[in-house]
Design a protein with these regions (language model features):
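Acidic/histidine-rich helix-loop elements
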Residues: 50-68, 92-98, 125, 130, ...
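Beta-strand-turn-beta hairpins that frame and shape the catalytic cleft
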Residues: 37-50, 155-177, 214, 292-306
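C-terminal motif of bacterial Sec signal peptides marking the signal peptidase cleavage site
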Residues: 15-18
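N-terminal active-site segment of His-dependent metallophosphoesterases
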Residues: 22-102
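His/acidic metal-ligating clusters that form di-metal
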Residues: 78-83, 174, 188-288
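Active-site environment of divalent metal-dependent phosphoester hydrolases
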Residues: 58-60, 92-96, 116-127, 183-186, ...
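Extended active-site neighborhood of metal-dependent phosphoesterases/phosphodiesterases
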Residues: 30-32, 99-211, 306, 326-331
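Binuclear metal-dependent phosphoesterase catalytic core
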Residues: 26-30, 36-37, 159-163, 266-268, ...
């Protein structure tokens, strides 16, 4: 792994809990840079992100066994640690405080920067709603930013800038992390309008700096309605397939798509700015997709990948045929590579190929 230097920008003293009212009225309308962490690297080529989805650590989990499995997942892509680890929601469900602390002690001990997004189950444990945030912020290698009392809904809305070291540094990629929230009545919640406005504010900040065309990936837990649209229009509701004739989309759908309670303008806003290359989610444990979806049917370079990543581990329901870790390797060409590694508990990891994925579904199309 190439040397990485971590810089955290703009956490202000008035954001701490318990600050006096003289700091200003709430909610706080903070500048874009207060949500940005920067990783400085020597070379963008081969910067690899390992994503864990839906660990579902609970009081029933044997954390010793599961940590051994997570270790196996981390090095499943060629035997080396990744450049960044992303925990993309539902790491916990019904866990104890001691398990949360032990898990983050372990992941911080790897010496790899790690990002965290909240899923709909993470706060369902025998601990306060602030515990996960507090434990993560105490970790040396965490990149989570969560300003308190701001005007952006949720607890994990922030940006990771990937900069190549030079004179001056060059911003190569941005990684966006969103709290896709929990529930709206009996349904799942959505990305709120103020979160969409926050994204627009971040994009405007890039324009103000004279760097408007920075590629990005988006990580969040709950999918948007576009995942279902892509399944219908590209996949024709067939369980698995590889659309080699047109979009190059690849998918296996083991369950229905559990998106939020209403449609939003989140995807459309991203497509308008033309910088975001993918929305990467978890949530539905036995779906694995790379939809190449262009909702406005414009130019090919305005397509957004809609990616269900692999579920990690055997916490609650799972399919051992598609379980392990997802790896995304950034390129200097504004593109990225995807590698899905199936990681059995007792056998050697192997890469999930298009042929393997197609073969999992009945009536698959190639």
């Amino acid at each position: 792994m190439k040397p990485i230097r971590l810089t955290i920008l703009g956490i202000l003293t008035p954001l701490l809990l318990g600050c006096s009212s003289s700091a200003g009225s709430y909610p706080l309308d903070l500048p874009a840079e207060d949500y940005i962490t920067t990783l400085e690297i020597n070379d963008i080529e081969n910067f690899t992100i390992c994503v864990f989805n839906d660990l579902h650590i609970s009081v029933l989990t044997n954390l010793t066994d599961e940590i051994a499995y997570y270790e196996k997942c981390l090095i499943s892509n060629g035997g080396e640690l990744p450049s960044l680890i992303v925990l993309n929601g539902d790491s916990f469900m019904g866990a104890a405080k001691s398990q949360v602390e032990r898990f983050f002690d372990w992941i911080d001990s790897k010496g790899v920067p790690f990002a965290y997004t909240y899923g709909n189950h993470d706060l369902q444990g025998t601990y306060s709603n602030m515990l996960i945030d507090q434990v993560i912020k105490s970790c040396e290698h965490a990149v989570l930013l969560n300003p308190i009392n701001d005007n952006v809904f949720g607890d994990s809305n922030y940006v990771l800038n990937i900069e190549e070291i030079g004179t001056p540094n060059t911003l190569k990629w941005q990684l966006y992390f969103y709290d896709s929230n929990t529930y709206y009545g009996v349904d799942y919640d959505v990305i709120h309008e103020d979160q969409i406005a926050w994204y627009e504010k971040q994009q405007q900040a890039l324009e103000d700096l004279g760097t408007p065309n920075i590629p990005s990936l988006t990580f969040m837990h709950i999918p948007t309605e576009e995942f279902e649209e892509a399944y219908k229009t590209i996949g024709h509701n067939v369980t698995s397939g590889h659309d080699t004739a047109d979009t190059e989309s690849l998918w296996y759908m083991g369950e229905s798509i559990s998106w939020g309670y209403k449609e939003t303008e989140f995807y459309e806003t991203m497509q308008e700015y033309k910088n975001n290359k993918a929305i990467i989610v978890g949530h539905d444990h036995v779906n694995l997709t790379d939809w190449h979806y262009d909702k406005d049917e414009g130019s090919a370079d305005n397509m957004i990948h809609l990616i269900y990543g692999l579920k990690t581990g055997r916490g609650i329901y799972h399919d051992t045929r598609i379980m392990g870790a997802s790896f995304y390797t950034l390129k200097d060409s504004n593109e990225f590579d995807i590698k899905w590694m199936n990681v059995p508990y007792e056998e050697d990891p192997f890469e999930i190929t298009s042929g393997y994925l197609i073969g999992l579904g009945e009536g698959a199309i190639a």
